[in-house]
Amino acid sequence: MYTFYALLNRMKLIARWSLMRSTTKEDLMQHAAHVAIVGQALGIIRNTYFGGNVDTDKIAALALYHDTAEVVSGDLPTPIKYYSPRIKSAYSEIEDVINGKLLESLPPEMAEKYAEYIRPDTDTIEYKLMKVADKV
């Protein structure tokens, strides 16, 4: 049985910054939607005002899937995740293993398509704009 969509449905159950005090609660699904909206806007601004030629739909799709590993790992607050290069590297390895398992929960022909968003090429302008949006 393929469980990819059931696993992604958990995004609405994963609280972000759960270990930190926050005035507004946000779940992983809300965060992904926010990053998609801001990222796509950044791409449209770049294309409209700065002569860019970025795929704004790809930015939005990258944003929707950028934290999918957290449906298994939960949210690790940014100050911890980036505390040291060693911790960042270890956490990246954990996320990669989880993302591999998520892709295995799809039929192979579909996993190939989703891999573009779950294990993206981090050198593209679309990915870089999505990461900027993730920090807003």
Predicted features, each with a name:
Residues 37-43, 57-76, 131:
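Active-site alpha-helical segments that house and flank conserved acidic catalytic motifs
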Residues 81-101, 127-128:
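Divalent-cation-assisted or electrostatically stabilized phosphate/pyrophosphate-binding catalytic cores
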Residues 2, 22-29, 123-127:
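Short, solvent-exposed segments of well-ordered alpha helices
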Residues 54-60, 104-136:
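Histidine/acidic-rich helix-loop-helix segments that form or flank divalent-metal centers
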Residues 4, 28-31, 59, 91, ...:
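Amphipathic alpha-helix face/heptad-repeat signature
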Residues 23-57:
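Alpha-helical phosphate/pyrophosphate-handling elements in metalloenzyme active cores
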Residues 1-19:
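Short alpha-helical hairpin
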Residues 43-47, 71-80, 106-115:
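Membrane-helix exit/interface motif
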